Amino acid sequence: MRMPSAISIGVIAGLSVAASAVPSLQKNGTTCTVIPLGNGQDDVPNILSAVDECGQTSGGRVVLPAPYTYRINQRMTTHLTDSRLEIGGTLLFSDDIDYWVNNSYRVDFQNQSSAWRITGHDYVVDGGPRQGGVDGNGQLWYTWAKGGSNVFGRPMPVHVFESTRATLRNLAIRQPQFWAVLVDSSSHINLDNFYVNATNHDSSVSPEGEWVQNTDGIDTYRSDHITVTNWVYQGGDDAVAFKGNSTNIHVENVTVYGGPGIAFGSLGQYPDRTDIVENVTVRNVRVQPSFQRAMNSGVYFKSWIGVNYGVPPNGGGGGHGYVRNVSVENLRLKDVQLPVYIDTCLSYLFSENITQYCDTSTYEFEDLHFRNISGNGLATVTDYPGKNISFAVALLCSEKAPCTDLTFQDISITLPGNYTGKHVLCENAEAEGLPCNS
């Protein structure tokens, strides 16, 4: 498997001007090939026509060949059945912020939105050997949303929605506007060999470095039997995140450069919803800092406070549910601030006195198993409501819902030689194989 360099975002280059003698939509049997119109013209109508002609026929192919760049100037739903969408080129989203804010598809979570929905069944989306894919034109969004978290209107470029038995592979997503990929209300989806890079070049956006919030690699939501393999993520936010009602998930061979790593959450934000994350395996993950951002954690779990305080996307809480039957194996750490932790006092209303609610969550974490975790932590102070924590492992569970049946085996996390504090913190947690509070 060949991946782009982890220290360079690369250059999205491609031909956006088509020869005038070449028709923009060519059909040969059940194969439809789209050539871009060029000159900034919208290629969505021709792509959708190709999908209608060849993407809903058994064995059909829709081909967007390299090295072309296709302008995506409007929201797009590609409904595929028993067919293939081959993206050798690059889908470049337009810079019309007003259009996207007002016209993107709405997502039933944190008032979010998406620009491209992929729906259907028994389909393949393939970027080919050169890893074609998406350029989200993200920098203009990073600058536009600076100073805010979860700013309304930033659309996700790839939204797998109401799909079954599908494979997405060999895709590169550069400069996503928001989360790069959302798998939502879908089942039996395989996502293999992805490269995601979100790099901020505007120093006024983030004083911490060349990263920006809400540029996750992939999030799962209300989905079952999802496989994520052979990913490289470089950005600064969650590489992989499991949102509510993500079940039977397998993640393997993921390399992360910068950010919080693998996230279970956030969960329990909505008081009228039950969030379940169950039967999850995370295996063979490597995490280390990037030039964009430090490596905040390797794997972490986050649930909202137990009272409904404020409104989503940055406020809320009081939701119910559980994370259960989780296995994290073969996690390699390099220069990680807080390698493993559980946080049950989540809120993004940073100016409010949230600490008073830190033991109110009834969200449950149980049957979590960690094996073969090694590398080094930095023991740098990490802010947590009401305290500063600096450990290899911190299990900060709620008094109302203690964490139970947690096991740790073959854990070897070294901290700096001049560090004299505790290595492990356990609050309201039962952890076998871990020297709690030592």
From Swiss-Prot:
Indicate the residues that form the catalytic site: D237 (proton donor)
Q: What is its EC number?
A: 3.2.1.67
Q: What class of enzyme is it?
A: hydrolase
Record localization: Secreted
Induction, as annotated: By rhamnose.
Q: What reaction(s) does this enzyme catalyze?
A: [(1->4)-alpha-D-galacturonosyl](n) + H2O = alpha-D-galacturonate + [(1->4)-alpha-D-galacturonosyl](n-1)
Its main subcellular localisation, reduced to a broad class, is: secreted
Q: Which GO biological process annotations does it have?
A: cell wall organization; pectin catabolic process
- Signal peptide range: 1-21
Please give the GO cellular component terms listed in this UniProt entry: extracellular region
Q: From the UniProt record, which GO molecular function terms apply?
A: galacturan 1,4-alpha-galacturonidase activity; polygalacturonase activity
Disulfide bond annotation, renumbered to this chain:
C397-C403
Q: Where are the PbH1 repeats?
A: 186-222, 223-244, 246-266, 277-303, 323-344
Is Lyase found in the keyword set? no
- Report the Pfam families cross-referenced here: Glyco_hydro_28 (PF00295)
Q: Which UniProt keywords apply?
A: Carbohydrate metabolism, Cell wall biogenesis/degradation, Disulfide bond, Glycoprotein, Glycosidase, Hydrolase, Polysaccharide degradation, Repeat, Secreted, Signal
Q: Which residues are glycosylated?
A: N28, N102, N111, N197, N245, N253, N279, N325, N353, N372, N388, N418
Q: Which family does it belong to?
A: Belongs to the glycosyl hydrolase 28 family.
Described by its record, this protein's role is as follows: Specific in hydrolyzing the terminal glycosidic bond of polygalacturonic acid and oligogalacturonates.
Q: What is this protein called?
A: Putative galacturan 1,4-alpha-galacturonidase A
Native source organism of the sequence: Aspergillus niger (strain ATCC MYA-4892 / CBS 513.88 / FGSC A1513)
Q: Which gene encodes it?
A: rgxA
